[in-house]
Amino acid sequence: MSGTADVAAVVGAVAVIVADGAAHPVTEWKDEGGLALVRRVAGLNQRAPIICAGAQQASLVERGVNELGISRLRLFGSAPEALRSAIAAIVSLEAGAAPQDISVSVLGRPMQQIIVPWDEASIGGRSATQVLSAAQLARLDARISRLWPPGPYALGSAAARLVRTALTRTPRVHAALVAVTRDEGAPGRSAMMPVTLDPAGIAALVPPALSSRDRVRFETTMRT
């Protein structure tokens, strides 16, 4: 993996990560400049997945899919994976468990519409709702929105993990920012969803097991 400001370097690449611009102060690619960059990247390399690594790049995913016609399986964001890792870290502290023993998903839209389905989360192989009390889960829910946006190192690490999983075809579920279809909710928007990956990009969306309350929250989020 290498970084460059030369757009022509994407020719022949197996994956492309869109992160920061070269200007000072450093800012994420977004808005019209970011969309123009995504257009050039997609034109120069018509096969590689394009991963938007930043926390402010939802519009690139949305507009790239809806305006440029790029497949949502090819153009998506990796910042939700950084958020998922941060959530796993605070769950591990609350539960007194190792972070690698935490399995948790994240859905919705940052930062006020973040949904963690605790019923399907696990800690050391046990259901999170069996390990943690209702008070502990409420305390975690109250902290989650403050974890957004993730820092630059967390964002970079998350993007690298998604690329590694995609290229090695590892059967691992990650959180990604995916453009929403009309059947799923409000078209033209994006949402955090669990996905599996392959060298072409997103292999499949993984439907989470949601409680009645979380399903209502998620469906409401997708419609707005």
Give short role names for the model-derived ranges.
Residues 8-10, 43-44, 95-97, 185-187:
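Solvent-exposed alpha-helices and their adjacent loops that cap or buttress functional pockets
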Residues 33, 37, 60, 83, ...:
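General structural feature for long, well-ordered alpha-helical segments within catalytic domains
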Residues 96-224:
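Long, compositionally biased stretches enriched for glycine and/or charged residues
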Residues 41-42, 65, 167:
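N-terminal cationic-hydrophobic initiation segments that often serve targeting/anchoring roles
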Residues 2-49:
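Rossmann-like NAD(P)-binding element
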Residues 38, 91, 219-222:
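A generic alpha-helix structural signal
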Residues 49-126:
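Rossmann-fold dinucleotide-binding core
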